[in-house]
Amino acid sequence: VNGATSIHNLQIVENNSDNTYKHTGSWDDEGQEYLESVPVELIRGAVCNPCLIIDGTSVEFNQVGLDKKNNTQTVLSVSKEDIVKETVVYDDSYTIEHKFKNLPDKNIILVWDSGLLPSEKLIKDDLSYFSVYAQNQQSYEEEFLTSVNGQESFTFDDNVGWAGLKSKYFIKSITNHDYNNLKAKKVVFNVNPSKVIDGAQTVNVNMECHYGYQDLKGGSLQVSSYVGPIDMKHLNQEENKHLSQLFGFGWFVIGYLGMAVMWLLTTLYSIIPNYGVVCILFAFIIRLFTGPLTKKSFLSNQKMQAIQPKLKKIQEKYKDDTGKLNQEIMGLYQKEGVNPLGGCLPILIQMPLLIALFQVFRKTIEFRGASFLPFWITDLSQPDVIIQFEFLKNIWGINYFFGHGIALLPIIMGVVMFLNMKMTATNNINPSQASTMYIMNGFFILLFNTFPSGLNLYYTVYNILNFLQQKKLQKINS
């Protein structure tokens, strides 16, 4: 943290067990070059982080004195216009406490300017996650900045306990020290919609927390700031537990499945410290559970195929009597023990898990910068691009939806899916349906081209195992 008792520039400096930086990758000062080996920088050139506005006058604290320092914390203090600001910086924590004393009997606005710096190389993807959020007396609310559309500010009122700005992997938050009792009357996020990103690639969002003087007991205000990663290690710390709801994968079943998947992946990583290997092992584990469903689906399709001649006879015989036709078809299904939905249900049952996996691999910071093979996949949170097309970087539609290069894993996965579809189509579907499936297969290759390589690695291995099982079942059946 550089500057005085305000945060002017802030980098995330956390070390791995081998003393390397855990979180790396930042844009340079001009926002033109992405520097992959430097620590993540989230705040740059800020003026007011945080400062006060009293009766329309900004009170900034730019001179600092070291009060005390020990093995766990550093205390800095500064005075201006009889107001004392004390800042407590803790070791091994991204939380910083800000204490203001001797405040006048006037309404106070606590201001935090500068916003956040995007941290990802694929900046368009990163920006799609930027949002402002607040916890008020009623509920947690969030507004994504992609929905600005000319709106110059977002206001959260009804007594706000904590609020902040969130990117894909990092957050900047302000929390009232006793947020169950002391709450801001409102929090306003000022956004310049025509300049959400400035020349240095900063997402410009200015946060204002409004307090009534009658709420500030003894003329003091104490808040804590958290500027750091969205991970359970830090958000589960006692002082940050209220922020843990920012770490989620969706609503209801998807959210719970996502948390279960994340727990299993991190547990496996504690045994095998390579998330690439963990993704492969995880695919085997999931196949143990979904394998019986795949077998059931295959057998159901085989039964359906076996009764096709009888179905065609019924359809020809009762083509002019819809009621009788449906009755005879259902009777045939019952007689032959065929469930018309038997081939679809196993797939539908797996859908919540697939959605949860998608959320985990796209949103979890543990995969950011995690390497599988140093000569191929060096970041499981990014596509494994093997050929770059620099001229596509600034074409937003192509860049955002299909990337600006060719990734290898989606091609491997696409080939496996094609072989699987071809094997299935030969036995179960007509040529026109097969053609549609092949076109969809090509579309999935393009779509997965922008997905994290961790997700693609899992899904590729999963599809290979699925293909091998289908091949074995087909051989047994023949």
Predicted regions and their residues:
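Helix-loop-helix
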Residues: 98-100, 112-126, 133, 158, ...
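Soluble non-transmembrane domains of integral membrane proteins
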Residues: 1-242
